[in-house]
């Protein structure tokens, strides 16, 4: 405990020449915060009976103050390297945007724009008009509307079309969409009355039909994109639900979630329905995300019948969930690529990464490991192992994409120790641990990441 006496007071540290130099270029409150944080850490070290006298020299404390000041001044939201192989990683920002969107964002962010100004008439315009035409073109729908995320899209649609009335939905489709947000909760918040039908694993058309009453306002289908029920199962198709809706003059709504706009089945060996299929089936209102399989920014997209979307456009809630100009610019830029499907598959990072073959990834991993091995310390060993990538983002939960992983080993360091060092690098590198090994998946690592990845690997050994 005598070491506590060696910890200087804040005022004394502030009087040091090195700190005085910092005060010339940094606000005093910020420097004081850095000093206090460092001294508090030193006190905690002493109380844990760790460390030695070398921690309390003026030079050692000054180094800590400089590091702490850098940390305080750094942005919390920062770029990192996704080496997990999870393409649409919810915690890592989901879909990276296409390179072609970068210039558009720069122009819109740092200047004025015609966000709500009609250049043709010189009068007030609508922000939603910028993407409505292209969304209708790509999906075949009559009308389109965009808000800030898919949960907001569902909330707006139900609030506009079914508040105070029953919404019939299969019990097996009452999904949790992440972050403890559940479809039943969103429905209740909208003012709609939840009417569950069927069983968890099997729901039939008769279940919906028997539940239709004068209180019914809407039939809802939720595409279960973030989980799968296998075995003894049955579900009602969109076409069947639409036919039932027509018989009772009820609108049918589908929450498609993942927002797939291209045929993925032959490329990935999966059966993920497209938004266009729901439109062709006659579904009246369809909602989906912009930052999942679509590969754009976070947004909630609504397409469907013109008169129903007109009702939503007049609802007061729309103002609270409206899309901002930067998201709108990024979304329009991404959607433009879908006019040429081949271009979309090549230039939208999410689609490009998903389409990489096992052979392509094996060659990429081989080249990357050889390239890195030349510049990392000798104690760092890189090896190739076969494995699988995941789609992520609540899409295609059963799909495993074959890949070749790079296993990183460093002397007697554990995988957890390696993971921590990589994660705390100036540009964090996030990998995964499997069977006691720290692994990097080249599927989600691009050329721009290599310098940061190299620096992180070089920093493993002090």
Swiss-Prot record:
Q: What is its main location?
A: cytoplasm
GO cellular component, as recorded = cytoplasm
What cofactor(s) does the depicted protein rely on?
A: pyridoxal 5'-phosphate
Q: Which superkingdom is the protein from?
A: Bacteria
Could you tell me which pathway this protein works in?
Aminoacyl-tRNA biosynthesis; selenocysteinyl-tRNA(Sec) biosynthesis; selenocysteinyl-tRNA(Sec) from L-seryl-tRNA(Sec) (bacterial route): step 1/1
Q: Where are the annotated coiled coils located?
A: none
Q: Which residues carry this modification: N6-(pyridoxal phosphate)lysine?
A: 292
One Pfam entry name:
Se-cys_synth_N
Q: Name one GO molecular function term.
A: L-seryl-tRNA(Sec) selenium transferase activity
Q: Which UniProt keywords apply?
A: Cytoplasm, Protein biosynthesis, Pyridoxal phosphate, Selenium, Transferase
What EC number(s) does the entry state?
2.9.1.1
Query: What is a biological process (GO) this protein takes part in?
Result: conversion of seryl-tRNAsec to selenocys-tRNAsec
Q: What is its biological role?
A: Converts seryl-tRNA(Sec) to selenocysteinyl-tRNA(Sec) required for selenoprotein biosynthesis.
Q: Which family does it belong to?
A: Belongs to the SelA family.
> Record's NCBIfam families?
selA
Put simply, this protein is called L-seryl-tRNA(Sec) selenium transferase
Which gene does this sequence derive from? selA
